[in-house]
Regions:
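Active-site rim helix/loop that mediates acceptor-substrate recognition in acyltransferases
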Residues: 19, 26-60, 64-69, 74
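Acidic/histidine-enriched, glycine/proline-rich intrinsically disordered or flexible terminal extensions
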Residues: 162-206
Length: 206
């Protein structure tokens, strides 16, 4: 962990700061503007959120500069058996504090805690080149595919204990709130923040 940073559980008093941080971290990265901060905001009271794993990073001045957000999710087999797993994301680091190991520290410490809490595995989508260092591999290696049955390198799984994912196979279902975003509510929510220009940039996904 980088010297000068401290890590602790997120508290309700941090919500406004972590949502603003998420907006700063994701603005114009994957699309013009972003919706990750709204997703975090809209899920605060959702039973799928795992508050025990949601951590923040503070700089030497006590300003929150990093945040990781966990939710329960599930893998459903063809015979209908449901296997509970977990996921993290968004994981946010303020642009001024990136490349200092904050994201890595948040991932490592929370995954260790998740293992102690006896969760079987973590399922995410992301950049394989980045996440392989934490033990993630192609989810298809565990017989896990996307909700639509597809398989792709960005869909990854990490076992949180030896053989814990052995019985898990089927289609992965993330929280529907991550996809079902009301654009009008997003615009109303985003209006409370300082204006930032939405730009279409090379490399964006949408």
């Amino acid at each position: 962990m980088e010297f000068g940073y401290t890590y602790r559980l997120e508290e309700p008093k941090d919500y406004a700061a972590t949502e603003a941080l998420t907006r700063e971290a994701f603005w114009n990265v994957y699309q013009p503007g972003c919706d990750e901060h709204f997703i975090v905001h809209s899920m605060r009271e959702n039973a799928a959120v795992i508050e025990e794993l949601n951590y923040v990073c503070e700089d030497a001045s006590g300003i929150i500069c990093g945040h990781i957000f966990y939710t329960h999710t599930k893998v459903v087999a063809e015979n209908g058996i449901v296997y509970p797993v977990i996921s993290f994301g968004p994981i946010s680091v303020h642009p001024d504090h990136q490349k200092h190991g904050i994201g890595s520290a948040l991932i490592c410490m929370t995954m260790k805690k998740a293992a102690k809490m006896q969760f079987s595995g973590v399922l995410i989508t992301g950049n394989p080149k980045y996440y392989h260092r934490f033990g993630f591999q192609d989810a298809a290696a565990y017989g896990i595919v996307a909700e639509d049955g597809s398989s792709f390198p960005e869909l990854m799984a990490c076992e949180l204990g030896k053989h814990r994912l052995d019985p898990v196979h089927g289609r992965l279902f993330f929280c529907p709130e991550f996809a079902d975003i009301d654009q009008r509510e997003l615009q109303q929510y985003d209006a409370q923040f300082p204006f930032k220009e939405k730009l279409r940039l090379p490399g964006q996904l949408h």
